[in-house]
């Protein structure tokens, strides 16, 4: 994957850096000569903005994202005492092996409903069969347009707000983390196109080509909570 490759510096300043990578036709099995750029910019309101852009001379699927692990209490502690809230009424349905079925599943009034703030501990310990099978959360939520994902730490003195123009977000609670870390020591928030999008034409279009480029962003804003 692109995460294991060395990207070149395109530009930088005191508060931003832009990296680029050129993927030749049939690199990793993907058609098209593709140019990709990712920029990271630190903004004045404690916001880290990540911009993704890509263009190709042939039609090819692209879904660049960020796979950071977040822990607002510090990396030596668990994320179980965090809370999470996001505006989404559905997830993309999955088979037993976690591949997408192409259908949607309502989460309204279910254990997976995150429209109201929930503790990650309560989610992980839920008797919901899907959560038990995954041993936590590892699901793609269908974001409501303009929605915000909000994560708060145990003391409620630090809040992470995520904004994006991607149509979905994978929420993963780190249940498969291994040494030197432990399970549930980090939370992943991965804005993306829906999993398996190329195989399901009714999903939002993840293809770029000569007449269509990728322009997506992730904004991560760190806010002080009510106690500060």
Predicted feature residues:
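An exposed, glycine/acidic-rich loop-and-rim segment of catalytic or binding clefts
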Residues: 1-228
């Amino acid at each position: 994957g692109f995460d294991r490759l060395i990207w070149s510096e395109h530009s930088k300043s005191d508060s931003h850096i832009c990296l680029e990578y050129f993927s030749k036709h049939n690199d990793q099995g993907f058609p098209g000569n593709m140019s990709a750029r990712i920029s990271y910019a630190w903004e004045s309101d404690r916001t880290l903005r990540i911009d993704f852009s890509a263009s190709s001379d042939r039609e090819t699927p692209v879904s660049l994202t960020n796979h950071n692990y977040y822990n607002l209490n510090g990396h030596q502690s668990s994320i179980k005492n965090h809370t999470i809230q996001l505006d989404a009424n559905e997830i993309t349905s999955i088979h037993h092996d976690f591949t997408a079925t192409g259908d949607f599943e309502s989460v309204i009034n279910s254990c997976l409903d995150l429209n109201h703030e929930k503790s990650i501990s309560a989610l992980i310990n839920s008797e919901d069969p899907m959560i038990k099978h995954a041993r936590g959360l590892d699901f793609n939520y269908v974001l409501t347009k303009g929605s915000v994902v909000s994560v708060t730490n145990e003391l409620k003195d630090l809040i992470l707000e995520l904004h994006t123009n991607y149509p979905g977000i994978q929420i993963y609670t780190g249940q498969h983390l291994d040494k030197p870390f432990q399970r549930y020591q980090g939370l992943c928030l991965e804005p993306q196109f829906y999993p398996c999008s190329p195989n399901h034409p009714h999903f939002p279009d993840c293809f770029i080509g000569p007449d269509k480029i990728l322009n997506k962003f992730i904004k991560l804003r760190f806010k002080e909570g009510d106690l500060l």
